Amino acid sequence: MMRAVADRTSTGLRWVAGVSVALALASCVFAATGTPRAGTPGAGPKGTLVIHGTGDVSLDPTQIPAFRTQGYGWAWSGMGGLFLRDDLTVVNLECPATDVVAPVPKAFPFRCDPGALPAARRAGVDVVSQANNHAYDDGPAGLLDSLNRIRDAGLVAVGAGSDQPEALRAASFRIDGWTVAVLGIDEALDPVDEVAGPDKPGTAAGHDFALALQGVRDAAASSDLVVVMIHWGVELDARPRQYQIAQAHRMIDAGADVIFGSHPHRLQPVETYRGRPIFYSLGNLVWPRLTPATWTSAVAEVIVEPDGTIRARSLAVEIVSDGHPVLVATP
């Protein structure tokens, strides 16, 4: 097993999909096996990939005061080193990691401590998505500083940028013979002007779903595997809305292979469509312990075999105290 190495090269391999649709509750461990796509593997040998995806992560010490006494390793110490044993770990960072203090008017602004990022990297986190409705909480200056701080910590940021092309551009990783693309899409805008523009910093795509689909297609054109991190839906909803299901299917039809959803702050069902897993909402990971519906969580685990077969399951997690998630059972 190899840890992710960023690279912009590509085999150019594309797959065609079989058909499989199933729903499972994400609060339970489940297994969903997709049919391998024709034509895999591509040029050169490929290994088995293990990818983990999570829901919302806050590294804001005003939201989680325990960080001031326990340190930022507290956020990850209950995961049993899970993210160090995989090939790629992606999380939704629900705040700008910045010292810029320029809060935009909103009910619940968040600001993460940039000093928390090295602990996330040491825990095995590789990619953080800023495609969410809090990345812009300190305006364009805070967002751009956050992206720089993330990179300085050895992490890769997706889902936001200095303009829309940068915000929607996928990060590319060369891992064990595979070219893996990861992109972030923000559908949960508050307000809408947080979205990036032609010459304006912000988050990716917004409510322009045609633009989001084009981002998926662009990533698929130069990658073997496409992972989409999307912030969408309605907070505290127990199930995805019909429009989300339709959008998820369209993203897979456009070339997405794995979809990790966030924003509702609680787990939602998992679907397998055309052999590709859709985690509609992974709930909270590093977050205050608020209600049973929001402190019961999961980490998505996706395994891609050398022949292209995709298996997926949810690993149960409980937020046992503010900012401290713990794996319920070690896999």
Q: What are these model-derived regions, one by one?
A:
Residues 3, 29-331:
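Acidic, metal/ion-coordinating pockets
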